[in-house]
């Protein structure tokens, strides 16, 4: 099974409440493709829902090191930091997410002209 299929299966498992299965599939995906941003993004969300906040933060930051301009990752990091009680970190991540959102909006506006 390729990384994309494994991530899709993991997301389905997660949506069905099978968190451990989703975590395993996503870990397997990252073994196969350690730089898969999609797998890291999904894994950070699964870990957060499992109350594995430190692990979720670690994976999310790893994904951001690969894709620093990924809006959804920055929003995820803010959510993780809120859960962790890191108000300053959450505010910083939220500010970065806001800027990334504006950049995306500007890029979309430029494409529509």
PLM regions: where:
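Amphipathic alpha-helical segments of tetratricopeptide repeats
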Residues: 31, 65, 98-99
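Terminal, low-structured helical/coil segments at or just beyond the last alpha-helical repeat
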Residues: 3, 82-113
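Structural signature of tandem alpha-helical TPR/SEL1-like repeats
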Residues: 15-25, 50-62, 85-96
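Alpha-helical segment of the N-proximal tetratricopeptide repeat
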Residues: 2-32
